[in-house]
Amino acid sequence: MTNRWDPGVTRALAEARHGDAFAVLGAHPSTNGRLLRTYHPGAEHVTAVLADGREVPLEAGPEPGLFAGELPAEGRYRLRIGWPGGTQDTADPYAFGPLLSDFDLHLISEGHHLQLADALGANAVEVDGVRGTRFAVWAPNASRVAVVGDFNSWDARRHPMRLRHQAGVWELFVPDVGPGAHYKYQLRGPHGHELPAKADPVARRAELAPGTASIVADPTPHQWSDDGWMATRARRQAHDAPMSIYEIHAGSWLREEGLDLDWDGLADRLIPYVADMGFTHVELMPVTEHPFGGSWGYQPLGLFAPTARFGSPDGFARFVDRCHREGIGVIVDWVPAHFPTDAHGLAHFDGTALYEHADPREGFHRDWNTLIYNHGRREVSGFLIASALEFLQRYHVDGLRVDAVASMLYRDYSRNAGEWVPNIHGGRENYETIAFLRRLNEVVREHAPGAVTIAEESTAWPGVTADVSHGGLGFHYKWNMGWMHDTLHYIGLDPIYRRYHHGELTFSMVYAYSERFVLPISHDEVVHGKGSLLGRMPGDDWQRFANLRAYLGFMFTHPGRKLLFMGCEFGQPTEWNHDAGLPWHLLDDARHRGVQTLVRDLNHLYAQYPALHAHDDDPSGFAWLVGDDAANSVVAFLRKGKRGDAPVLVVINYTPVVQQGYRLGVPQGGLWREVFNSDAGIYGGANLGNGGAVTAEPQSMHGHAQSLPLLLPPLGVIVLAPQG
């Protein structure tokens, strides 16, 4: 019996070091037919059961758990394994041939496998009539990989995998393992050293934190009921359509008795609220799996798995489906820039810098203590793009807000001289990231038609939303960080000093049409000591609420799509805390309820009047009437839609002084209705305004033959539209 086993091989198997288990285990041709070797540490006996029912007891080998015996030259067999606690009847994992096709492996190695989680990861499948799970992981520099889990007592000796050399992929079909099984990969590095057990980078389901295992996902697809939405999505998300985004952190939007809602509970509460408020979209802070809740999801490790914090992957699909049925789009924040250093994650995955750059000047982000993806490696960029498509296709997500784009575009981002590596031309631009982002956006347009990508890009990088064919990055929209910074600084000033900073109010129109913009009042503006949006407003309580209402009125009438973080819509007075729910009890206060009503009305106004959204990206949709009245801190402008759309007049008074008889030219005569007034009593204001309507007078002003004499409420915004 001992001549059936090489001593070096048996030691390597017993020590979980052997890198080519298929060369030893399973049935191999012999002089008497086939020699079957199996390794089941802890087993007391093993019998091979042939297809005709005959049984071949296997003899114990030189190491505990090793068994071998002679089988006929042909025919299938199963194993009957005697354990101390009972008997297991199963197929032999080492009786199956290579699983992934050569074409799959080619696509993986080229970074072009767009359904990557159908090839890699854990897929519950049937092979040769046997049900089980196919495990596959990219680890080209590992000397050995085994899958460990609750199905093999987490024993790295039990299920070593086969290396498919052309792509660096290790694979194994494990019979009888199905959805719900917990697993990880146990790898040895290129020199044989054992690495920390790794979660599956392509797992479609993950264990609830603080657990770090991956879970075999249920392959049953969600039964979607959103055909109507998907058929009209491209129109709903077109550049000339209204887009008002409500950004939320799913774990802290609403807490009941200190507990997070699951996806179904969130859908029950959130969707009716968003619909009532008039938002067109919800934007979820990252829902990909992440180890540390305090990162808010911006340091993810499971880029193919919706986080288990809110339930199952199908629960997330149900949430999206229900949003769509109510006419609400779903955008998710997505992080392809960097990842955390947790030992069970992507860091030094196979004992080398696989997903990250090896040089810390390229591969380590000191601001966040994270590792930076190597976008120049085909397999890594392909991994990220496949993650994007996973959420856009599998979960019908309508858009990705791509996080930290500026940190990817510049090699010297947040680095001093000598701390970064120039590109091949000696410059700071990251050519590899540029190529990655362009390909991402091209792939999204082709394979997720109607979906959008939104860049959080904080610099003046040119052409972020320009077509790739024109040298741009190809995003659909970009956050207008300049507008946000300038206007928040302006509104935070005492009105006495605003006259000296008037340009901060008007400068955004200089570049408003250089990109397709979203105006973001995001979570970033209510954390890290910045306080709340209401807390930034100067003055006493009356002035603070009036300033907030005026600021929101300005935001909703300024060119650009809108994004508002949860809590801002009712004037949350404290900084956001992800460990606590929003202070919904404040809606018992008429002042906060008034802000909420104002935001609801602004959303409906914005959607109702094409002039406020149809030409957000076209200079013909905006005309200054008054942009230089710094002394009174007043601005006035016309918003214009397409031919036949009524114009809208917007007037803003950023002082607490009432302006009487403030005359403004208008492009047509007749009655102009006051369709919005931030000082209305229903919003908590003093009800100062123009009695609901003003009739134009034949007095020329601002290049127009007709003009309106207006009362401008203090710290207020009024919007007028011509009757009929």
Curated annotation (Swiss-Prot):
Active site: residue positions: D403, E456
Pathway(s) of this molecule: Glycan biosynthesis; glycogen biosynthesis
GO cellular component: cytoplasm; cytosol
UniProt cross-references to Pfam families, sorted A to Z: Alpha-amylase (PF00128), Alpha-amylase_C (PF02806), CBM_48 (PF02922), GlgB_N (PF22019)
Record-annotated disulphide pairs: none
Domain of life according to the entry: Bacteria
Signal peptide positions on this chain: none
Catalytic activity from the UniProt record: Transfers a segment of a (1->4)-alpha-D-glucan chain to a primary hydroxy group in a similar glucan chain
This protein's UniProt keywords: Carbohydrate metabolism, Glycogen biosynthesis, Glycogen metabolism, Glycosyltransferase, Transferase
GO molecular function: 1,4-alpha-glucan branching enzyme activity; cation binding; hydrolase activity, hydrolyzing O-glycosyl compounds
Enzyme class label: transferase
Record EC number: 2.4.1.18
GO BP terms: glycogen biosynthetic process
Subunit structure: Monomer.
NCBIfam families to which the protein is assigned, alphabetical: branching_enzym, PRK05402.1, PRK12313.1
Role description: Catalyzes the formation of the alpha-1,6-glucosidic linkages in glycogen by scission of a 1,4-alpha-linked oligosaccharide from growing alpha-1,4-glucan chains and the subsequent attachment of the oligosaccharide to the alpha-1,6 position.
UniProt similarity note: Belongs to the glycosyl hydrolase 13 family. GlgB subfamily.
PANTHER family linked to this entry: 1,4-ALPHA-GLUCAN-BRANCHING ENZYME
Descriptive protein name: 1,4-alpha-glucan branching enzyme GlgB 1
Organism: Xanthomonas campestris pv. campestris (strain ATCC 33913 / DSM 3586 / NCPPB 528 / LMG 568 / P 25)
